[in-house]
């Protein structure tokens, strides 16, 4: 049986079973204790099966911790609606449907190393590196005379993701993107 943990002892990054046996990743939590009542733990969690992020409240609850497996794998190619990844140690391959990678697919390019998250034999998703270099497929022309501080223009990456970039970025440039928010960070320097 898995280890039980008191709600007030939850820490960011832990995985637990939710009230309906969903697998939840703790993103944030706060513990509020009042003099006359039992403390309340407000917890922001991500459902690893659906990707939904919600706030839950626990009182003196004991929660079951979930032991998830993490494995480093490299992206090989896209096969229809599936992304194919390979373990560099044993060369085994897995396919993950793009529905499980709604946000992540915007930043998955050839040879990127990701961490595949599984529970027993169920694939829950992938963790990307914090920063990834990606080529710009198309960038609007810079507006002549627009020298305002932080002037931006639209660009599209080779993955199809669109974002705002500085005026000096051109089609074919490689840029660094933060995968947590999808924002431009810097021009890629080899």
From Swiss-Prot:
Main localization (coarse): cytoplasm
Annotated keywords: Cytoplasm, Elongation factor, Protein biosynthesis
GO molecular function: translation elongation factor activity
Example GO biological process: peptide biosynthetic process
PROSITE patterns registered for this protein in UniProt: EFP (PS01275)
Subcellular location: Cytoplasm
Pathway linked to the protein: Protein biosynthesis; polypeptide chain elongation
GO cellular component, one term: cytoplasm
UniProt xrefs under NCBIfam families: efp (TIGR00038), PRK00529.1 (NF001810)
Described function: Involved in peptide bond synthesis. Stimulates efficient translation and peptide-bond synthesis on native or reconstituted 70S ribosomes in vitro. Probably functions indirectly by altering the affinity of the ribosome for aminoacyl-tRNA, thus increasing their reactivity as acceptors for peptidyl transferase.
Record-linked HAMAP family: EF_P (MF_00141)
UniProt record similarity statement: Belongs to the elongation factor P family.
Protein name in UniProt: Elongation factor P
